[in-house]
Every structure is written in structure tokens, then in C-alpha cells.
Amino acid sequence: MPNNNDNFSVVLANNQISVRNIYAVVRNYPAHAKEMGSTVNNEPIFFQKSLTSLHTGAKIIIPPDRNIHHELEVVVLVGTPGEFIDQNTAIDHVAGLALGLDLTDRDLQNTLKKQSLPWFLSKSFKGSAVVSEFRMKTDGIWEKEYWLKRNETIVQTGKIDQMVFPITKLIEYLSAKTPLLEGDLIFSGTPQGVGPIKQGDNLELGVAQEIFMEIEVE
């Protein structure tokens, strides 16, 4: 199997962590909101990806007849469960951070949007929640620019301090709507530069000079 992750887990400090829920936030970078013809929101807006969309392997298989887009994101791993978490203590609930791709069936998403329907089906196909190994939240590398390369060309870059709603605010807001569990993942939004991928592409995700993940698209 290309995923090799049928137990739906991620890795932090050589430990396997079982994933419970996968949440994602929309339009958390102003430039991305603009490129999508939209604006940022007054409050975070979340959607969910299916647990079966989780992918940690070095190869992904995409439907050849679909317009699949990459969306590079910093992914949060919840380590300590809680609800109604205060922003000032929210970081204490974070076990680690990773890079990920919120792969999106763009044509299907646009069709669902026009019908005012949820995006779930366009965001939850098998392999659409790509996640690297997690790093400790205290790792100073997270202050640096993160990036996505497609066939050795940088197509997306971002920094955590460019977010409209910082990670701690996302945790505060989401935990007030639904309890967060140990092993929950939060995709924290994508910077500008989203675009299509196709079979034969090679993708690299990294921060500063360090490569976090290499992926072959099949």
C-alpha cells in the first residue's frame, strides 16, 4: 500500500501517536484569501478531513482525471486534551508541529461551493491529508520560512507569524466548539501559491534549509 499507515498514526520523537480527528482552517493567510478571490474572516472557519485521508508515506496516488491542488500547511498535533482552552495556555496542549499538504479536488470543491454544500468530499479522498514526521514545538526552526517545492521549483512559502489567527487562537476557538482529544490534528491554513499537481511530480516540504518530506506523485 502506498500509505503504509492503516493504523492512522503519526510520528513524534520516534513514537507512534494515534490520530483521532483531522481539523483544518480556511483563509488563514491574507495573500491566499486574495488569490482565491475572497477575504479573511472575523473568526476562524473550520472543516474536517476524514481519518482515512491521512497519509505519511513517500508516494501518493491521485485520481488521474481530477484537478488536485496542493495546499502547504503547518500541522498541529494535540498532546493534551481539553475544552474551552484559553489562548494564553493553548501552547501547553500542543505536542508537536509538522508540515503537511491539504490536497484538494478543486473542481469538486468549486462545484460544492456553488451549491452551498460542505467541502468534505473534495477534501477527504484517500491520501489527501499528507503529514510529515512531527517535531517538538520548542524547536526554533518553526520561526523560519517553510516551503513546498514541485519538481525542484519553490511554489509555496510561508511563516507562522503571517497567520491571521495564530495557532494558539485556533486552539482556543476550536476547543470552545468541540473538545480536543489527544492525537487530534489541526491543519493551520495555507499561504499563497496553491496549484495543481499531476502524476510524475516530485514534491519536497521543508523549513529553512531542512527537508521534512519528499513525495512522489503517482
Predicted regions and their residues:
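Catalytic-core "active-site belt" of small-molecule-metabolizing enzymes
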Residues: M1-L181, L185, G193-E218
